[in-house]
């Protein structure tokens, strides 16, 4: 075991018993988090002053249906937390506009690969500073990736496909960063454009706030002071209430032209309240409204509704423990789900049937993947074969604020009652829910089902599936919240990671998709969602990207006539 392996083993021990909720509680107990976390020496923005700021045309206000639960870019793996982080944090490169396979320079001004794409070299942009004024050079970029990989949380599993040891990343001079993958890795470029994980942090500042060997993680979950390079700084974070970004005057991109000075995120869980706020002009952007709310807003000429299919698949995680421990029991759940009623009756055309666990927009999707229908007789037979008796109690846990998902769960509840299964639906706040998804409690202590949705970090089916179902992605290591583990699936993942032959690569991905859908279900994959974003019609510069779902490039957005 290398020095890195020993270090990583020690750190995984430190992190494995923690989840985001426990870290937040620990930070609060240590006095890190006042009632409203205030950053950068600025005072809290009161409700009254928030309303005044919203009236400022240079302020963009977004109503979110749930609160960010984490501000550390090296652990964030949910989109509500990722949404504001596009303001303060940047990567080496990014996706270009709405493209899923074209890239633009950000902190790196240029990059190239050797002939077999096993070594990638990035030249850093000159003159970039962190928000504390310190320079961004190749060494601090290397240190940022070392922190990310060594912590080993959430999105780090995606990077370990390409880089297993931080020693594979070097900084031979002040402006050059080299990634030596050891094997041909043509997808490293795609990975480094992701909004989850490969973002550059000012590690020396984080380490000044280290506690018990956590790399400053507990502090960075609630603070961004001096850590980022982006056009905006986080100046206030009041969990479950609001988060405020203000522009960083010394941003390397400059401030010529029309830009927002401030971005306010208001946490409004009630669907009807968010709809009223966008109608009344009290907020500029909302998403995740119900189909009924979107239809009610369609005739409003003051609003623009963007409807775009994305890389997202919606599903119910099936925990591989207790009554659902066997493939037969999980197959029964898949046969019992009311697919047509949910798609047509609940989502009203804002989604379509998923074909397995991968969106049709993602490279590696197999359209021949097995697709269930609703058949309660088959479900009943499979439950009997799995020795799951009538009267069995199951719990489905979901995040509050998703009225459409709740309606779908209630229809499922009705179907299960017809075959003798009692399903309880439990709604919890985002922080509690991400504790279930990313926490490390045993499978036996988890809900039997969890309503979740997922899209890839970059445009690749392997990446889409690996965090959800790989045996080493349980709990805080990824998003395998059901503790699924299939030996054949893991064998295919391990054999295919570096597969250079496109045909063999696709064959392995197709087999994985069939196994998790038909033979040994990991989840009930029921819908490919049509993502909707409602904007006031004076907001310019919004571009939907099917991979970067639920985030906004605030720097290129503006308000008409406010220059």
Give each language-model segment a name.
Residues 96-98, 195-255, 262, 270, ...:
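Gly/Pro-rich hinge or "lid" segments in bacterial periplasmic/extracellular proteins
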Residues 29, 33-44, 80, 238, ...:
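Detector for C-terminal structural segments
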Residues 63-115, 146, 227-231:
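N-terminal lobe/hinge region of extracytoplasmic solute-binding protein
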Residues 123, 158-210, 236:
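Surface-exposed binding/hinge segments that line
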Residues 220, 250-296, 422:
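Ligand-site clamp/hinge motif
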Residues 232, 352-385, 400-407:
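Structural transition elements
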Residues 1-22, 26-37, 44-45:
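N-terminal secretory signal peptides
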Residues 109-154, 172, 178-180, 188, ...:
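Aromatic- and charge-enriched surface segment that lines or borders ligand/interaction sites
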